[in-house]
Structure formats: structure tokens, C-alpha cells
A protein has these predicted regions:
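Sec-dependent N-terminal signal peptides
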Residues: 1-11
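Alpha-helical segments in soluble extracytoplasmic regions
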Residues: 12-82, 97-129
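Amphipathic, charged alpha-helical scaffolds that flank and support histidine-based chemistry
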Residues: 85-99
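Short, solvent-exposed mixed-charge patches
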Residues: 133-136
């Protein structure tokens, strides 16, 4: 039974780097957009959902660093940035909203590789633990 649980945990850990990379890729793509469009808002909502999924997956995998909380915050902030962009009536308000969005997206680009690395470290530690257990 413990072996099955450990296997499920490591499978989850092996998927985390791909999810972190997806969050990073989405953040980079959204950063390049310069106009408020329905596609931008939908992209931000997708990014927010993926950041929230990454947060939950990190938490479920037992990553004890602040990363689950950080990605939860990024997901919440992304939704707020989408609302801010939709409410912006003037060029100045739009410029401010885009600046705020880009700051958030830049943070995601910088932090997503840390999430992938933390998951890889945990997967390696889990594999070593299983190897030791099998030898005993």
C-alpha cells in the first residue's frame, strides 16, 4: 500500500515541472500583448486557472516552501488584473493596468522554474527513499 501511495506521489511530482513550464509560457505570451481584447482576458483567466492548479499540485505534493501560497496569490492577482484592464476607460488607466499585469507576469516567469525545481528535488528525494526501502 505504501508503495502505491509513493508511486502516486512521484507521478504527481513528475507532472509538476510541465505545469510550471506551462504557467511560465503563458506568462511570457501574455506579456507580449498590448491591447485589451476578449482573447487577452480569456488568456489571463486561463493563466489564473493554471497558476491555481500549480498551487494546489504543489500543496498536494507536499512542497513546504512558500511556493503554493505564491502561486495562489498569482492566480488571485491575475483575476484582479483582468478586472482592472476591463475597467480601464482611459489610455492612462490602461497603461497602468498593463504595467500592473506585466509586473505580475514577470514574477510568474521568475518563480515558475523554482516550482519545477522544488518538484524535481522532491521527486529525486522520493526516488532515493524508495530505493533505500527496496534494498532493506
Amino acid at each position: 500500500m505504501l508503495t502505491c501511495i509513493a508511486f502516486m506521489l512521484s507521478a504527481n511530482l513528475t507532472q509538476l515541472p510541465a505545469l510550471a513550464a506551462e504557467v511560465e509560457t503563458e506568462a511570457r505570451a501574455l506579456s507580449a500583448i498590448t491591447e485589451v481584447t476578449p482573447a487577452l482576458i480569456a488568456g489571463i483567466e486561463d493563466f489564473s486557472g493554471d497558476a491555481e492548479r500549480l498551487s494546489a499540485a504543489l500543496r498536494e505534493a507536499g512542497v513546504e516552501q512558500d511556493l503554493p501560497c505564491i502561486f495562489h496569490g498569482i492566480a488571485e492577482d491575475a483575476r484582479e488584473r483582468a478586472e482592472e484592464l476591463q475597467a480601464a476607460d482611459t489610455a492612462s488607466e490602461r497603461a497602468t493596468a498593463f504595467t500592473n499585469l506585466r509586473v505580475l507576469l514577470d514574477d510568474a516567469v521568475l518563480i515558475a522554474p523554482m516550482a519545477a525545481s522544488a518538484a524535481a528535488d522532491m521527486a529525486q528525494a522520493e526516488a532515493q527513499s524508495q530505493s533505500v526501502a527496496l534494498r532493506n
